[in-house]
Amino acid sequence: MNLTDNAVIFVKGGNGGKGCVSFRREKYIPKGGPDGGNGGNGGNVWIYSDKNTHDLYHCLVRKNFIAEDGENGKKNNSSGKNGKDVIIKVPIGTNIFFIKNSENIIFGHTRFHNQKFLVAKGGVRGLGNNYFKSPTNRTPMESTLGKLGESFKIKLDFVFLADVGLFGYSNTGRSCFMRSISNVKPKISFYPFTTLFPYIGSLNFLNKDIKFVDIPSFIEGKKKNNLRNRFLKHLQNCRLLLHFINLDVKNVKKTINKEKINIKILKSFRNLFLKPIWLIINKTDININSNIFFKQAQFVSNSLGYEKKFFFISLNDFISIKILINKILLFLEENKR
C-alpha cells in the first residue's frame, strides 16, 4: 500500500453550554425559587494510537476534527448533556507536533497500542441561576456562558515500525522483491521511477511476521533534501537494511562509484549507516560466468564497506529468495528489539 506519512490537521474542543436562567412556576407555587440548570461541558479531542491503523490517509481526507458542543442548561434544574468526544486514530510510531508561530513543537509520540493524548480540551460548562442562589439572593438573575473549547493546528508525522528496510537505485528489483514475498503489489516495470512513495508490506514466514518498507530512490528524479529525508526516516526503526544493486560486470568501478553516492546519503541521515546492511545483488540469472561474477561482487561489497555481507538473488528463482528470507529471519531472531 502507498504510505501517507504526514498530515496537518485542525482540532477544536467543543464549547461549553451556557447556563439557564429560570424560575419554578407551578399552579400553587407562583413564586418558586430559581431552577435554571448548568450547561454541559464541551467534548474533547483525543489522539489514540491504534495497531490496526497503518498510515495517515484519513487525516488528509478529513482535516478538521471538531468535538461536539455541550448542551445549554434547561429549566427544572436540568443540566445540558456533555458534548461527545472526537477520537483520531493514528499508527504506532506517530509524532505529534503543535504548530505555533510556524514552529513545530513536539507534544508526544505514540509507542504502543491504545496510547491516548488529549490534544484539545472542551470548554467548561456555564452555570445556571440555581447555582447562584443564597440566603441573601433568593432570585438570582445571573448565569454564565460556557467557555470556548481549545483549538490548535497539529502536524502528524508517522515513521513506520518496519523490521527490514529496502533502498537502492530505481529498477534494481526492490518492487519485484516486495511483490514476490509480501502482500503488497507495487507498480512494476522495466523503467526507472516506478517507486514514487514508500511501500509497506508484511510476510508471514514459518509463523513469523516480518514487516518490510521499500523507499524510493535517493537520487533519481532530483529529489530535494527535505523529500529525501522524508523517505529516509522510515529506515530509522529498521533492524536490518537491504541495499539492492545491479552489478555492471563490464564496468565494476562505475557500479562502485555510483553506489557510493547512496552510502554517502545514508551516512548523512542520523547514523543510518551504522545499522546492519546487507548488499543484495539482483538479476544474477543474466550473468554467464558465475566465478568471475562472484569475485566482482566480493570486490564491490568490500569497496562499499559491507565486507562479506552480500547475497545473490534472482527474482526468477524463488529458491534464492527463500534462502535470503531464512537469513533475514535468523538475523531478526538474534537481534530482537
UniProtKB/Swiss-Prot annotation:
EC number: 3.6.5.-
Main location class: cytoplasm
GO terms assigned for molecular function: GTP binding; GTPase activity; magnesium ion binding
Chain sites annotated for binding Mg(2+): 175, 195
Oligomeric and partner information: Monomer.
Keyword Magnesium: yes
Domain Obg: 1-161
Family the entry assigns: Belongs to the TRAFAC class OBG-HflX-like GTPase superfamily. OBG GTPase family.
PROSITE patterns: G_OBG (PS51710), OBG (PS51883)
Subcellular location: Cytoplasm
A Pfam family this chain is assigned to: GTP1_OBG
Cofactor(s), by name: Mg(2+)
Species this protein is from: Wigglesworthia glossinidia brevipalpis
The name this protein goes by in its record: GTPase Obg
Enzyme class: hydrolase
InterPro entries registered for this protein in UniProt: G_OBG, GTP-bd, GTP-bd_Obg/CgtA, GTP1_OBG_dom, GTP1_OBG_dom_sf, OBG_GTPase, P-loop_NTPase
Residues that, per the record, bind GTP: 168-175, 193-197, 214-217, 282-285, 314-316
Chain ranges of the OBG-type G domain: 162-333
GO biological process: ribosome biogenesis
Its biological purpose: An essential GTPase which binds GTP, GDP and possibly (p)ppGpp with moderate affinity, with high nucleotide exchange rates and a fairly low GTP hydrolysis rate. Plays a role in control of the cell cycle, stress response, ribosome biogenesis and in those bacteria that undergo differentiation, in morphogenesis control.
Presence of keyword Hydrolase: yes
Alphabetical keyword list: Cytoplasm, GTP-binding, Hydrolase, Magnesium, Metal-binding, Nucleotide-binding
GO cellular component, as recorded: cytoplasm
Coiled coil region boundaries: none
